[in-house]
Amino acid sequence: MAMVRQFDEETVLDQALNVFWQKGWQATSMADLAEATQVQRGSLYHAFGGKEQLFLLAFDRYERRFLSEAQAALDAPSASLALERFFDVAITNMTSGSPPRGCLTTKTAIESEELSPLIQARLRALLDALEARITEALSRDAVRAGLKLPPAPAAQVIVAFTRGLAVIERVYHEPAQLHALAENFVSLLLGPAAPGA
């Protein structure tokens, strides 16, 4: 007779996500995950396969939520409004939690010397998906007209800038500073359209 799980998988994944986000991939242990989820380590291994598999499933949730929020923010009638809303989402993502958790993608990428190929691929996939969504949003005629750069290069520098913001957040823990930096960055991107944009 098959054993019935005594826990809700969705709840466990949300709790695991919070632990990984708060402590980081490397510092999180299976004991931490068992304590946070109130599920024994053996049951976690049986249900999810191990720390890396649990991280990847939790990261799926993080990715879906973040990309959905970013997409909604980018759906604006002008470049300035789209970028303002996007950076609000990105900064809120970094500064949420108590204490603030930072950006899970950037924390994971920089915290350890070697990441498994699976985790590297997942981080890359999120950044690529984010860049694609930004490019698509900036390609709309009404939005593109306000940019100094063509949409694809603009999206690349926006994604790179968000990684810098994530590092600044870890050092200073000042949301107002992050918003000011984002506002200044947006002002550099806006203006007469680049030739051929």
Annotate each language-model stretch with its function:
Residues T11, Q15, V19-Q53, L57:
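Helix-turn-helix
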Residues L57, Q71-R101, P151-I158:
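Hydrophobic alpha-helical connector segments
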Residues D60-F66:
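Short, basic, alpha-helical segments at the C-terminal edge of helix-turn-helix-like DNA-binding modules
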Residues P77, L81, A121-A125, R140-V157, ...:
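All-alpha amphipathic helical-bundle segments outside canonical DNA-binding/catalytic cores
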Residues L83, G97-A121:
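Amphipathic alpha-helical segments used for helix-helix packing
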Residues N93-S96, I158-A176, L188-G196:
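Amphipathic C-terminal alpha-helical segment
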Residues R101, K148-I168, A180-L188:
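Hydrophobic alpha-helical segments that form the core
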Residues L115-P117, D128-A154, L190-A197:
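Hydrophobic alpha-helical bundle segments that form small-molecule/ligand-binding pockets
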